[in-house]
Amino acid sequence: MTKPAADASAVLTAEDTLVLASTATPVEMELIMGWLGQQRARHPDSKFDILKLPPRNAPPAALTALVEQLEPGFASSPQSGEDRSIVPVRVIWLPPADRSRAGKVAALLPGRDPYHPSQRQQRRILRTDPRRARVVAGESAKVSELRQQWRDTTVAEHKRDFAQFVSRRALLALARAEYQILGPQYKSPRLVKPEMLASARFRAGLDRIPGATVEDAGKMLDELSTGWSQVSVDLVSVLGRLASRGFDPEFDYDEYQVAAMRAALEAHPAVLLFSHRSYIDGVVVPVAMQDNRLPPVHMFGGINLSFGLMGPLMRRSGMIFIRRNIGNDPLYKYVLKEYVGYVVEKRFNLSWSIEGTRSRTGKMLPPKLGLMSYVADAYLDGRSDDILLQGVSICFDQLHEITEYAAYARGAEKTPEGLRWLYNFIKAQGERNFGKIYVRFPEAVSMRQYLGAPHGELTQDPAAKRLALQKMSFEVAWRILQATPVTATGLVSALLLTTRGTALTLDQLHHTLQDSLDYLERKQSPVSTSALRLRSREGVRAAADALSNGHPVTRVDSGREPVWYIAPDDEHAAAFYRNSVIHAFLETSIVELALAHAKHAEGDRVAAFWAQAMRLRDLLKFDFYFADSTAFRANIAQEMAWHQDWEDHLGVGGNEIDAMLYAKRPLMSDAMLRVFFEAYEIVADVLRDAPPDIGPEELTELALGLGRQFVAQGRVRSSEPVSTLLFATARQVAVDQELIAPAADLAERRVAFRRELRNILRDFDYVEQIARNQFVAREFKARQGRDRI
């Protein structure tokens, strides 16, 4: 009727075998007995005993029979008893092959779980579709081997504890056999709480925490555990598609990257660190793993998301909810650290946002090291010979959340999560088409490469360890950025933001965008399919129309031809899209500003160019990721290679620099970076007469007020730099320049810093004027071409 999942003859040929049958119904026992009869017929000289495996959390009395079977004196001799093989066996029930999405959702209803059918359903399955029933045998182990493991890893001493240990090992072996049939996406840690609480390692650490108890640690493990179920895993893709229903149903992958990651995950456990722009990211990663039949990830999320029915459902599909602000709870920190180490040791994959929270500006935030340090501790402690840090780039053609981000930038409060919030979030996804979701997997970073071998020097040097963690995390983030494709949304938004509310025609949009596309092609930067379509007028029209109706572009159709512009109230929303592509133009923008600075410099202009390029890199380091200093200089030199003998022309200065900039395509600094320096300048202006140790909240409030004044006066080009989000990093820049701390010369240095920023903004004006000259010349040439037709 059924066949075992594994070649059971390989594990039941021992002279003396105890079969532990994990059954829930008489039907399952009948199937196992039939399977066992086949084994006895194949191996008539072998002895096969069968015992029903006690269920989890069984009372002590239920273990009596197993305790007796494991006693050395139970067999003909103590030695033969220790050589006895233990083989766990179970019946697994497969879902129907043609199950629909509705069928996956219906599995949540009582009595509809296809993996755990009732006895009546089991008999019907055996009559109508017997292939859905499979007898699986877990990996065998000798009693002596199990007893040695028990003594080495646990603190227990009683023979009943040994029986419980054997039961857990049997269930774990069956779980491994089960996911080999169901697929790697069903792989998940089991029995974490009893395994950890029985661990000698865990108990020893617990004893070192004053006031810590096993009971309290157990409650924390219950809070962390995923409560995994097959039905919930099946629902991951269903819920993921529901949450992302406004996007194209098929995610966009790089198949070569997927193949490389699959090979890497077969060799080592991994932490998948994803870029975070939307709450949708939390479902994109699990769905991406399922789409590509890759092992699942166990994702960390804030416990604020564990509400209503979603909390239990997300927990059972692999979400690990963690508390916030755990610095004053040494027991919770210890339990969390050991939990992470246990999961890694068992070769399961973890995942969280490398940024720690959603980026509400569209650009990547600095990496957070909290959970990463726990994984590093597990590696350095020898719990794995290597752990891979797999970056995941997730980007979108559009997001509905940008409206919330724009309000937040203007000073609004964050909307609290809850059932109403969830309803509105999912509802918003279906209001219109948001385009594609792009998922990229750059080459993974090896923890061994950055931290050295386990038990190495870093275990004794916390400062060196933290520095290595920072370098490792920045490398992951850098690779994520390099793999992130440039989207049409970002390019169109960047262009329209530079016009400051002036509308452009389709031809103007199309002609102007070509320089950026040429640059991306020369640099071999990854671009989205939507960006590739910008080569045609139809592709530009589609991109502009997709952003129209205030999302965040306005289209005007009342004249001879349609025109598009960004209204002042939509600038913050458009900036999110623009910011998502800055990484591709960051270094070339710095080149332009350094050239503009060199034109006004006295003495060696080449030296002034390089000094200003490095200075701009230093000022922008809190907003953007950069290559290390050596690589950055090499990249800048490569950017300058577009102009032959550039150092000679730069040294001449004057009109030569004008010509160099006019010949450069594209000129991007005004579009990409001006707003950040305007935000810095607003904060610097506030600091002129602010207290030396002004607090962050007071500084932000004053900057918002002054920024609104500057907008009204036209002292900044738009309302975009008046943003709490930009002021937060502007304050970091000020702190780094030692401008928010008492000092004798503080007032003078604050004035000097403001003057420096104003000079940089003057350089922006200079480059912008040349860019406008390029635009006018391009339009004149295009008009001549149209007139000749």
From Swiss-Prot:
Record flagged with keyword Transferase: yes
Subcellular localization(s) per the UniProt record: Cell membrane
Gene Ontology annotations of biological process type: CDP-diacylglycerol biosynthetic process
Top enzyme category: transferase
Motif (HXXXXD motif): 276-281
InterPro entries, sorted: GPAT/DHAPAT, GPAT/DHAPAT_C, GPAT/DHAPAT_LPLAT, GPAT_PlsB, Plipid/glycerol_acylTrfase
Enzyme Commission number(s) of this protein: 2.3.1.15
Pathway assigned in UniProt: Phospholipid metabolism; CDP-diacylglycerol biosynthesis; CDP-diacylglycerol from sn-glycerol 3-phosphate: step 1/3
The UniProt record lists the keyword Transferase: yes
Catalytic activity: sn-glycerol 3-phosphate + an acyl-CoA = a 1-acyl-sn-glycero-3-phosphate + CoA
Membrane topology of the entry: Peripheral membrane protein
GO molecular function: glycerol-3-phosphate O-acyltransferase activity
Family annotation (SMART domains): PlsC
Domain of life: Bacteria
Entry's Gene Ontology cellular component terms: plasma membrane
Keywords for this protein: Acyltransferase, Cell membrane, Lipid biosynthesis, Lipid metabolism, Membrane, Phospholipid biosynthesis, Phospholipid metabolism, Transferase
Family the UniProt entry places it in: Belongs to the GPAT/DAPAT family.
Domain notes: The HXXXXD motif is essential for acyltransferase activity and may constitute the binding site for the phosphate moiety of the glycerol-3-phosphate.
NCBIfam families: PRK03355.1
The name this protein goes by in its record: Glycerol-3-phosphate acyltransferase
